[in-house]
Amino acid sequence: MWFWSRDPARDFPYDVTGEREELPAGWGVQKGKKKTGGDAVSVFTYEIRPGAEEQTQAAKTALKRIKTLKHPNILSYVDGLETDKCLYIVTEPVTPLGTYVKLRTDSGGVSELEISWGLHQIVKALSFLVNDGNLIHNNVCMSAVFVDRAGEWKLGGLDYMYTAGAEDTAPLKGIEMEKYNPPEKTDRSKTSKEKWSADMWCLGCLIWEVFNGPLPRPTALRSLGKIPKSLVPHYCELVGANPKVRPNPARFLQNCRSPGGFFCNSFVETNLFLEEIQIKDPAEKQTFFEQLSENLDSFPEDFCRHKILPQLLTAFEFGSAGAVVLPPLFKIGKFLNADEYQQKIIPVVVKMFSSTDRAMRIRLLQQMENFIQYLNEPTVNAQIFPHVVHGFMDTNPAIREQTVKSMLLLAPKLNENNLNMELMKHFARLQARDDQGPIRCNTTVCLGKIAPYLNPATRQRVLISAFSRATKDPFSPSRAAGVLGFAATHNFYSLTDCAGKVLPVLCGVTVDPEKNVREQAFKAIRSFLDKLETVSEDPSQLAELEKDVHTASVSPSVVGGWAGWAVTGVSSLTSKFIRTGGGAQDAAASEGASAPSTASEASKPDTAPSSSAPPAAASTAPTSYEPEEEKGAPDNSLDRWDDEDWGSLEDAEQNRGQTENDDWDTDWGHGKTQEKTVDFSSSRSKTKQVSPPPNRTSALDDGWGWDDAFQTVPPSKEHTASKSQQLEGTRPASDYNWDTSGSSGRQGDFFASLSEPSSQKNDNRNSDSAGDWGGDDNWESVEADQGLSKAEMARKKREERQKEIEAKRAERRAAKGPLKLGVRKLD
């Protein structure tokens, strides 16, 4: 029979922890948690004592009532237990309102916004009990109100509840609760009243206690104290001596919700919308989330964490809110600790990165600084970086820009392959081919800032070549960024590279058209010269100055203060220049030019400025170039870098037929075809030419360089022959006076005729004069002696070929009978 004598409390599935806080009517409340899942709860306990039968009966009534009443504003019942010795009521985790107010005193007290919403909830609970349940609470006071984790108020204390009209059956209150009784309780002459009159009087007592502290006696209700002015008229109705004047809870709620009322504020409006968010239209949800971020600063922290955040997560997962949930989501994320952030925010962020919604992607990139510290390296490399890199190839310039900027935050968490291979490959393509100058500039900026995270081999391959390419950019901020990049990463270059590779590039920038670029170049040159001079005077300092060259990882503070980093670094520099069309960049690139552009130049993609080649002297020959064309023409034999096309990707076509040994050749190594419109003063006709692939002879002109990547492709025979002809004195193809009459002919035959050795040679030219842009006489003699004769020869050959074709056609027409099956027509 031991089974029947066992204590039922031992099987209670909850552990009671924390200190017991005493409540009226013999109850006490403690914190607890479920034994199996560890869920937090609050445990209300009542010890049954002999001689307190009426109070025990009221406690049992409270247990019965709370089991059956279900309302969002009434304390939620979880579990309960009734034994001969005690009563247990398990509810959601809550704190008594009196304790909550005391805890908030140190932090400035409970705000009026919180109180307004709390009172709103209590009045709604009373309206439900009186109007829907026909019940009288009969115990509305501060000790009967509890606050949950989100700061929402719940109505409890159901010990003295009774059915409306059955006042005689109501349990008797204790002496400590008599101060909350309405005047008609003792004055039998006031028998005319409404069923809600007693509860509304108690509501007035609650309002007084919330603003002024515990109620000492009923007469204290006459003193308003700290009650807000907007609430005073409605408060006076509640504590009026005439019970008939006291409004119904629903009417009181409506009065306080009127314009200027105590319940008319953004906090209450937000809560009311969240309660009905599941039935709201998508357009209403969109507007709500857009305005929510502005109001969060004035909302309580606990409310944001436990009430708004779950709604935001639900709206993203099951709704169509989209990118508008991101700003409030990340703003609330600041209130979370690291574990909560990992549990609630990070899974949503990872899922968002796989979205194809552009607005979502750009918002994520813009807000990355808010959550990057909570992302671990495996998550970044496996789930985030593969989606982020798609932004490098997006057609929207704003997304490309934000993707570049985000690399500053992601780089420290990227693994070896993603950082040194994948990211560098995308940077290479952006810097060489992106049609937006500011994006090319920011790519250079970002490369300089993440240089400390690159491994030494990648730094040696990339930095000099990338910054050298940037100094050739037609966009002046990009050129300045290239110069500043050299200066910021000076500790990553050996003294040999400083003298042989870096300084020659910087010296070429000293004649840049932009004064700011020139000034930065001179500063950088002086810095490198001081470094070289220091080692020259004291060779023992060589090891100290080159200590970071082969260091695997260098502190990013090394490049932290480099002269403003191309105007504004990776702040919103691009927004000043990026436009919807391509003309904005052309205008920015040509800004400050002394000579006006021709119509043909305005339609061309960006071409790099030729600071190394001086403009040719004015010639008296009728076949001389326009001055604007000569100024931008590169020296083909010495510096073919300027043939690089900085225009849009659509205008640049990759050379075909070449074997690729690595991915870097795809992005950097191949020359690009470039169209140029040439004006001849004699005929004024415009002819398009296709320049051969750039013939780089300098280590500094290898794009992003990567000496192995650019030299793995063997030159073709035609390219080798063309190069040898240039060195022997043959002029570029652009110098011939092209005959427009032959434009309809076949271009292959025309170039074949040009490749034949000419019967006339210019004795005045020798191998040393190849690439000399200053010899006007040489240019004139070449065009006068060879240009016209070759054109005539080509025209004659085409005419002969045309005659042969016409003769064959005539033979076929003259032939009688049908053609044999299987015979293939040649023309």
Curated annotation (Swiss-Prot):
SMART domains: S_TKc (SM00220). Residues 586-624 have a biased composition (Low complexity). Residues 641-652, 774-783 have a biased composition (Acidic residues). Pfam families: Pkinase. It comes from the Eukaryota. Residues 679-690, 737-746 have a biased composition (Polar residues). Keywords: Coiled coil, Repeat. SUPFAM superfamilies: ARM repeat (SSF48371), Protein kinase-like (PK-like) (SSF56112). InterPro entries: ARM-like, ARM-type_fold, CIK-Related_Protein, HEAT_type_2, Kinase-like_dom_sf, Prot_kinase_dom. Residues 1-309 form the Protein kinase domain. Belongs to the protein kinase superfamily. Regulates COPI-mediated retrograde protein traffic at the interface between the Golgi apparatus and the endoplasmic reticulum. Involved in the maintenance of the Golgi apparatus morphology. This is N-terminal kinase-like protein. It comes from Xenopus tropicalis.
